[in-house]
């Protein structure tokens, strides 16, 4: 069963699961993810759909962001939103749960 341990070690995202000192827990969902990118560097696919509860697209063209919620609202169900990002970014969505 040694191969299971090797698989665990080879996962880069396992190394960022621990809380870093001085890190804001509210931002853990995205900022500690290896797939996280800054808002300005994101280039969403043209067919990206907002989650069902976030229908107001932000003026900078990121449809999964709404005016009254952070970008996490479409990544996590804990915020009360359905999290439709799982269709487009399954890895990011899985990380958020």
Swiss-Prot record:
Disordered, as annotated region: 1-45
Source organism superkingdom: Eukaryota
Comp. bias intervals (Polar residues): 28-41
Name assigned to this protein: Putative uncharacterized protein H1-10-AS1
Gene: H1-10-AS1
